[in-house]
């Protein structure tokens, strides 16, 4: 509720703000389209290209300073090996992830600092290079991935994060 003790209370036009925590992106999208929510910053991955194509007036795509990354457990016996970690990095097609999975105008990031950060464009030495990834795995004793152990990826409950994790899983196979 509006705070009557706020120093400029007479100029505050909102009487109250209600926050509805919604754990499912599709549910939140439906609630927004049904008028149950006035604001959302969530667009389900599968809806974004449709909203862009149809010129949805409620869709605003703005620059967002963020990167998507996985922390690697370097204490894991296999992941202690730098070449294995590099192979995993070289096997990820970041451009394909933003074009085919997230599909909402994101830019592929190749470093922790996202593209366009105050004019900073980082040089990367980890481009998509599946041949080099296979070579590094083979040099580490895993020719064609034979004998390579199963690794687990932990991610939050977002459907978009699940789809990205599945894409990366496929790229690593």
Where are each of the predicted segments found?
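Ligand-site clamp/hinge motif
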Residues: 3-50, 169-170
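Short beta-turn/strand-loop junction motif enriched in small, turn-promoting residues
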Residues: 3-7, 56, 75, 142
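Extracytoplasmic
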Residues: 12-14, 54, 65-67, 108, ...
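Pocket-flanking alpha-helical
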Residues: 25-31, 44-58, 70-74, 78, ...
